[in-house]
Amino acid sequence: MECGGFVLKTLKKACVFIGMVVGAGFASGREITDYFLLFGDKWKAGMLLSGMLFLIVSTAVTDIINQNGIKTYSEYLDVVMGGKSAVFTEWVSGLFFFVMFFAMTAAAGSAAREIFGVNYWLGVAAILIVCAFIILHGMKAVEIVSIILVPLLILGITAIGVRAGDETIEVVDKGGSIALSAFIYVSYNTITAASVIAQSDRVKNRYDGIITGILCGAAMAFMGYIIGRTILSAGSEVLNTEIPFAAASKELGNGYYLAYVAVFLASVLTTAVCDGMAAIDFARDKIHISREMALIMLIVLALLFSFISFSDFVSKVYPLFGIAGVLQLMNTVKYFIKKK
């Protein structure tokens, strides 16, 4: 019974982590294209490296939280960083939680308009209502959503990738360091990790961290590889589109495009609820308001910022928060290694 409980808790934690990372930027194929495919033949090595980094970070974060009994993001930063660096990172990351939620809101609006042919604001309203319901029911609801949707995400991406075949185009290397690109990609995608995992059930088993890490690293590298290969199999025209994975899926037939739509919507929802939870906890801690008031504030701000297009969030806003992600990632790994 104890073993079964440990496995379930670890699996839930891994699903929450994966659901948090696999947002609209990942599911659209835009992140995979910009951070990996544009490096030509080196993209596979970069994808493997990113998987290893996800493994290390998720293992370290989980282990640090378990060993120190950490319950909040602020406590986590005090442990791994401390001082002014922790304060700076916490405030920048707190803003990032809000921005990520706004980006997922914009992505839902874009999906409503581009995929379903309905009003942009209908999509925005729908995602806000669903997120509000889940967030009000706490971390348990987020875990349930993640453990249902993440396996479906992986299956959907796999099904599309299998149909795509093995023939791919060659991309001219744009130059630069694929290792640095992978590092930046992982750093900003894991900013929310500590805030969300700190709210999950702690597990005393010493293998919790490494199993969580293996599941997260393997899933992210596998899905990234499948998305990248699918895009390359569809030709150079698809590579240059705003949502390359959607364009590649559409070329495979209506059934596979519908599978992509399901993948995209699931990725938007899982990331939105994780970042929404983190944003609300940050607001409660800093301005001392109730969860309900913090949720209302989040929804109002999301409506105000929804006029920014999703593509602008990914290309112009995300990179601004990279420094907080890099600081957190480096200090997390440094602390983890030092304590071992």
Where on the chain are the PLM-derived regions?
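Hydrophobic, membrane-embedded alpha-helices of multi-pass small-molecule transporters
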Residues: 9-27, 94-97, 101, 161-167, ...
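Extracellular loop-to-transmembrane helix junctions
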Residues: 9-11, 35-62, 211-225, 317-326
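Juxtamembrane transmembrane-helix boundary signature
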Residues: 17, 48-74, 230, 234
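Small-residue-rich segments of transmembrane alpha-helices in multi-pass membrane proteins
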Residues: 21-22, 46-47, 79-90, 149-165, ...
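Hydrophobic alpha-helical segments and their helix-loop junctions in multi-pass secondary transporters
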Residues: 24, 98, 142, 151-175, ...
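Membrane-interface loop-to-helix entry segments
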Residues: 81, 108-112, 118-164, 314-332
